[in-house]
Swiss-Prot record:
Family: Belongs to the histone H1/H5 family. HCT subfamily.
GO molecular function, one term: structural constituent of chromatin
Protein name per Swiss-Prot or TrEMBL: Histone H1-like protein HC1
Record function comment: Might have a role analogous to that of eukaryotic histone proteins.
Low complexity: compositionally biased ranges: 82-94
Residue numbers spanned by region Disordered: 57-117
Ranges annotated as biased composition (Basic residues): 66-81, 95-117
Keyword Chaperone: no
Keyword list, A-Z: DNA-binding, Repeat
InterPro entries (UniProt xref): Hc1
Pfam families linked to this entry: Hc1 (PF07432)
Length: 117
């Protein structure tokens, strides 16, 4: 499927879900069932759209349009630089933990063991 076809299919499914959702809110049980099934279909189509859009973006089929001047001006006003005053935190002292020695596993062998050999 082409990216445009997938987008159109997504729009159609969304419109269908919206119509049926209105009916389901009024108590129509069949419409509620259609909403559930269509939402599953929409999920599958959305996955296909994601894959296609990534593929199109990498191959250069999708190009981003430059932002208009009004949008750029609004963005710069919002992102006005604020003075950053940060006090350097004192370096934290490392917590020293005592390592406990491993328990010795030196058991004395019994005399009977030596006798068996």
């Amino acid at each position: 499927m082409a990216l445009k076809d997938t987008a159109k299919k997504m729009r159609d499914l969304l419109e269908s879900i919206q119509r049926d959702l209105d009916k389901a809110e009024r108590g129509n049980k069949a419409a509620a069932q259609r909403v559930r099934t269509d939402s599953i279909k929409l999920e599958k189509v959305a996955k296909v759209y994601r894959k296609e859009s990534i593929k199109a973006e990498k191959s250069g089929l999708m190009t981003r349009k430059p932002a208009t001047k009004a949008k750029k001006a609004a963005a710069t006003k919002k992102a006005a630089p604020k003075p950053k005053i940060q006090a350097k935190a004192a370096p934290k002292a490392k917590a020293t933990t005592k390592k406990t020695p491993a328990k010795a596993k030196a058991k004395k062998s019994s005399k009977s063991r030596y006798l068996r050999k």
